[in-house]
Amino acid sequence: MYNDGLISLKFKNKTCFKSEYVGFDAIKPINVIIGKNNSGKSQLLNSIEAYLNDKLGDTKYKESFCIKKEIIGKRQESVNQIYDEMSKYSQYLSINRPNFDKMLGTYTFDGEKISRIVDSKSIPLTEYVKDRYNYIATNVLEVRKYWTTNKIFRRINAERDIIPEHDIPSEINVQNITSNGAGITTILSQVYNLKRYKDDDRTIRSDILKAFNKILGKDTSFIRIDVKRITDDNTSLQSKWQIYLEEEQKGLVELDNSGSGLKTILFVIINLLLIPKILNKPLSSFVFAFEELENNLHPALFRRLLSFISQKIIEEKSTLFLTTHSNIALDFFSTEKEAQIVTITHDGNSAMTKTVMSFSDKANIINDLGAKASDLLQANGIVWVEGPSDRIYK
């Protein structure tokens, strides 16, 4: 998304973003949205999803939005048409074609009309030419065509789970994987058990296992991931498919009994590795929105998960929007040049966003989140070992 010409994106609606346009002054590969619970983080992701799916005008959303996007090299036929029209007014606008293309580089769209399309301080334009230019651009460019970016949007909700599921359809459909985790077991059962996928996808199964163990680090190591049919306790006629993790000492362990932290890790891996493989699309074709991945993850494990995600997103030129209220995510991405941190706050009436630029901004975020030194140990106190006697500080 960041490499598809989108420069900035902001939204305004009647529900959450009432007083001002809320969003991003710039789009980076990794965009961390940090704020308290119920501050509007999920609503902002809803707006991004609606933008990418060209649904901002639907009754459900009814949002106006400001968008600034490069259009050079996109729909060149329309650009040529505008230039041909504008050449009639060349006496007012003495520029050649390359300069014209440069001038046409960005536009801002607000609601249902272009509020500014000429973005050039170096080229003087009369008001007549500006008005005529905007009129032509509105009608010839058909700006709605530029709302969408042909990106595939994938989301992981804060409320999520991976559970046993019935049946294995003969065809894989990634649309059946919902943002709360439904469909994960089914798609893995297809990849691991249907012959045509089982024979073709040995590499991806190996990649999934390697990524899983890389994120887990020294905490534990699995030698195999498998999906097997289980029989319901109530009746032998009902059966489900269950994901299993195999450890060398413990044998097969049901994912359903392994804790939600491992489920989150697997969910992320499925989105970043398996779904692009199934769709035969590069990761750069995707925009990901992950919500509160820190839930039920140990801090060190969460850092390794963030490291895995950031490496994939940056190296393969994808885009991530990550919501969090974790100071760990703030620390992790605060020095990453390919990431930005945007705070979202709510005054009781409307949400507001601000891009974090300074150290004091980061300190204010930590205070706003209510983070304490003892959170390092997820405890109410820290034991400092200074000698023969210990003391608990609170």
Spell out what each predicted region is.
Residues 8-10, 23, 64-68, 106-108, ...:
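Ser/Thr- (and often Asn-) enriched beta-sheet segments in non-cytosolic proteins
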Residues 1-58, 236-375, 382, 391:
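Switch/communication elements of ASCE P-loop NTPase nucleotide-binding domains
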Residues 68-219:
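Coupling/switch segment of ABC-type P-loop NTPase heads
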Residues 57-65:
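Short beta-strand-centered segment that lines the nucleotide-binding/catalytic pocket of NTP-utilizing
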Residues 1, 134-143, 224-226, 230, ...:
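A short, compositionally biased domain-edge/stem linker segment
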